[in-house]
Structures are given as C-alpha cells and as structure tokens.
Amino acid sequence: RAVTQADYENLAYRMHPKFGAIKRCSVQKDLDSQKRNLNMYIVSEDTAGKLTLANSTIKNNLKVWLNQYRMINDTIDILDPYILNFGVNFVVKPQKMSDKFLVIERCVEALKEHFRQPLFIGEALYISDIYEVLKNVTGVLDVVKANIYIKSGGDYSNSSIEIEKNLSSDGSYLAVPNNAIMELKFPDVDILGKSR
C-alpha cells in the first residue's frame, strides 16, 4: 500500500523495467487541489544515458502499476518536469610547478565525475560543491571563480531558468523549482576551464 509521497516514489522506481524505466521521480502534493491529489514528476533516460521526457506508454504503464497500490482517495497526475541543461565555467590558479593544461584537464574530469549522475527533480545545484571539487584537484592552488550557465535550444532542452533570480543570497546554490531537474548534458563541451 502506498501511503506517503515517498511510498509512491519507491513504487515508481520498482516498476518492472519491461514496462519502462524511470530515471528520476518526485511526488508532491497538488497545492491547487482540495482533494488528496498528488503530482508525480517522472523523467527517463535515452540510449545515450541523457535525460528525456517519459513517453505516454511509460506513463500509462506507471498509472496501471500504481493503481494496484494507491489509497482509494488518492488521485495521481503523472507529469513531465522541466529539464534544465547547464554548463560550468571555472578559473583556477595552478600551483607554481604544475602543468596548467594538465591541471585544467584534471579539473574537467573531476567535474564530469561529480555530475555523472543527474540531480534529483527539484534538487538545488550547489555551486559551493563545484568550488570544493575543484579545490581538491591535484595541482590547484586556488579556485578563482566558478559559475553555471543555462544551455538551451538545439540539442539541449528548450527550458530555461533565470540564474540570478534563483541564486541563494550568498551565491552558494541555485534553487531549482520542484517541477524541474538540472542536467549537465554534454560534459565534454559544457565544462569550460581556464587557468590564471
């Protein structure tokens, strides 16, 4: 039986893969509803491991799957989250005897590993974590600057967010709406680093 929002998320992840795979799921109470209506945001992966909106077959299969376990008074709307693609810019100061090109390469690899798995739906993106990752790279003396930017159109999602309006007051994280998910889609081109 599914009682809590976490129960529903757990059930969605446990749906048999032959009915479709869900990469990320977030269940939230529908604040516009007087009844016990829940909004379930789901996203899938394509064959390249990139986030993609779940197709109608997966959504229908999920609805049938959840109906076996839901409380009689619960209604569930299965919705698409906004996929927000982003990139990272950074400037580091290498240690004196370090090869600056090798240091930049190590920094890019460390960030690729950090963002290998997409964040969860509604999860904040911590810019402070980017600083921390870069600071721990061998050969980095100091992290001069690190920021994120939105990538949209073409091979990227068409969704966007105003970064300045959604940054925390201290600039340490980007608040992400509950119906959105951040993805570093093409790390080989979306991470740009310089040395100073």
Specify the residue positions occupied by each region the protein language model found.
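Carbohydrate-recognition loop of C-type lectin domains
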Residues: 1-124, 184, 191-196
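An aromatic-glycine-centered, glycine-rich loop/turn in mixed alpha/beta architecture
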Residues: 1, 102-196
